[in-house]
Amino acid sequence: EADTSILLLSYTNRAVDEICSKLKEQSIDFIRIGSEISCDKAYHANLLRNKIQQCRTGDAVAGTLKDARVVCATTAALNSNVNLFKIKRFDLAIVDEASQILEPHLLGLMCARSGNADAISRFVLIGDHKQLPAVVQQTEAESRVTEPELLSIGLTDCRRSLFERLLSSFKTVDG
């Protein structure tokens, strides 16, 4: 739908640039959250900083954000810019490479508020838990969960992504 506000997220800047590439191919306008250092030159004009450069008032900045139908970012970049949710809410967030993203990178976004409403209404997680696992440095012993409340929701190892944990909780007997 034309008025649906979509947030496209991924773990790496390269993956976000790939998303931006597909949007450009389809002539879909978007805002990219990030910096010129982390973003391919082809998308510098789409960076939020550059999109609002001509805005002379706070209302003009807010209007630019509110009017943006598609916003792209890494989870880290969005977590660093949560003030965005004071201005804009999203109908849908699509998270690519979700199997690489640990829960702390997503939980803040999933719980974010915009006024009295959820900042993001729905999430779609896309990934392959057998292909791109979360990147962690902790050992199995350091990552083992022992808290009964966390174990009760299937959180047994802090090295597993939310995507993998959710997937395993919905697997059937047949696999």
Show where each model-derived region lies.
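Conserved helicase/translocase P-loop NTPase motor core
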Residues: 57-86, 105
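Conserved helicase motor core of SF1/SF2 NTP-dependent helicases
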Residues: 4, 11-14, 26, 76-78, ...
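ASCE P-loop NTPase motor cores of helicases and related translocases
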Residues: 1-71
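Short conserved micro-motifs at the rims of enzyme active sites and ligand-binding pockets
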Residues: 20, 42-45, 83-85, 135-137
